[in-house]
Amino acid sequence: SGSSVSSAGDINSDGFDDLIIGASNASPDGIENAGSSYVVYGKTLFNKELNLSNLNGRNGFRLDGAMKYDQSGASISSAGDINGDGFDDLVIVSSDSVLLNGIYYSASINVVFGKSSGFSASFNLSDLDGKSGFRLIDLEGSDAVAKTAGDINGDGFDDLIVSNSFADPNDIENSGSSYVVFGRSSGFDATFDLSSLDGSNGF
């Protein structure tokens, strides 16, 4: 663990900021290199050591990659509050999702919505359904990063910025692209294709 680390914001809105720790080469439940990310809830007092295997849903939880070689947790960050529900959200990059939208070895971006309670000890990113979060697809290559962009259009919802250095815009090989996805209160599907950005939902 510790291949990537970040503040997670306050995903359960208890007044304490939380941590997220990536382990992109982990093999949860025997799924080779699916990757895992660990969320540790903030609180007033900690022991001098914390074993991540002891996260139980009350003190934090584990997020597992959707498939073999997913390498989820390669990049992790707070996503701000994308859906404006008062809970900070998480963004987790899967760097080598084997097949997404016809592109082999392409990255995908997983957004997990925060909430006050109800996280189990582990959650598989394949279970994101639009209500619990969603996955951004149509990224070329394995090199992608996503971060909160703040509220760039002033609608009260935090937005997400995604960089993809291996993208080929206008047939210019590996010249790279960045995408902004606007936050909103509802209407997220389980997957969102970045090629559908049209100016009203991002650009």
Located regions from the model:
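Conserved beta-strand/short-helix segments
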Residues: 1-203
